């Protein structure tokens, strides 16, 4: 059976020339949440950038749902395999401006933005009290992390890649946000790949991988 998501092999070194990982590939089915953990500085964020096409490797293959995406089609790949970055970058403007931002780009042409869906998802992560016209600069780091998650879910990519998106949240917000990720992941034709440092979250994922000593290995 052909895997839903196939990517690699990737190799990377840090700024001092030390190997972060070597010949790492992923072959994953849809309808699941895959957690990746490992020591700090071990290359997890770098690997996610390769998976999403934000870092380029000329020798790596990329396939999604039976379709290959060569390097010339990286912009298409990036619209289908979306990264929620660890620092939750935002643009100047309102909460609505930030949620709408992907839809204003070339890849989002023709895709509608639904205020009602935005409010529903914000309520699901405990931010229902925030009006959509609230200035983003007035929000805390934890609120921005949850807004970045909502933005990724609204974009509805085939593969959602989350880099420590739930870091710094209170336990209630972590549970609510992870439940949303799981619900998204369990849909046919969807996949979530995430990095957590929380053993409880790794245990709830459908698959648990560990990146350490340059290798990506199955934990369960």
What are these regions (language model features)?
Residues 37-39:
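The feature captures the beta-strand-to-loop junction immediately N-terminal to the Walker
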Residues 52:
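Helix-to-loop junction immediately C-terminal to a conserved catalytic motif
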Residues 61-76:
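ABC ATPase NBD Q-loop/coupling interface
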Residues 87-101, 107-109:
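Conserved catalytic motifs of ABC-family nucleotide-binding domains
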Residues 113-131:
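Conserved ABC ATPase "signature" region
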Residues 135-139, 143:
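Conserved ABC ATPase signature
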Residues 152-153:
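ABC ATPase C-loop
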Residues 160-164:
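Catalytic Walker B motif of ABC-type/P-loop ATPase nucleotide-binding domains
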